[in-house]
């Protein structure tokens, strides 16, 4: 599946914030989830919303706070996708 440029950049930027020993599994799980989300919407391309949604679905709830801080620092607007709580 194709990824649009912003989605790929966001994915790589967030992934870079994840500890090295977890990065491999996070990369696999989040990429797979993002592609599933895009397919479920009958799209041929992963968009930034899919990436954000995938990170929230695949990241344990206890780590959402630090992940949100990382997204804020990167300028990724997760709140516009409904993840403001």
Enumerate the language-model features and the residues they cover.
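Non-catalytic accessory segments flanking P-loop/AAA+ NTPase cores
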Residues: 1-85
